[in-house]
Amino acid sequence: MSYSAFVQARDFLQAHRTDYETAYREFKWPELNEFNWALDYFDVMAANNDRLALWVVNEDGSEQKMTYAQMSKRSNQVANWLRGLGVKRGDRILMMLGNEVPL
């Protein structure tokens, strides 16, 4: 499973972040045939996760908050929108977004 292999490697590095020699000597790169950040990491982490993921305080004092689950749902909506425009797996696209919560 890509998620668990990645998390295991990440956790090892975090546990040894102040011990460079051990981290360098014992770290093993996870064997990942394929890895998709959105599907293999973020979606797994976001599944039924109602913890706060993003909290933006605007200049006027208003706030925008989103949970991991909400961000995952919105990401899926954008992916489906792109699919509807004809974007296929493997296509390269560039999206320019402002510094704001809505995609």
Where are these regions (language model features)?
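A short N-terminal helical cap/helix-turn-helix that marks the beginning
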Residues: 2-14, 33-54
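Active-site diphosphate/adenylate-binding microenvironment
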Residues: 24-33
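Conserved AMP-binding/adenylate-forming core of the ANL superfamily
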Residues: 50-101
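Non-catalytic terminal regions with compositionally biased, polar/charged low complexity
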Residues: 17-24
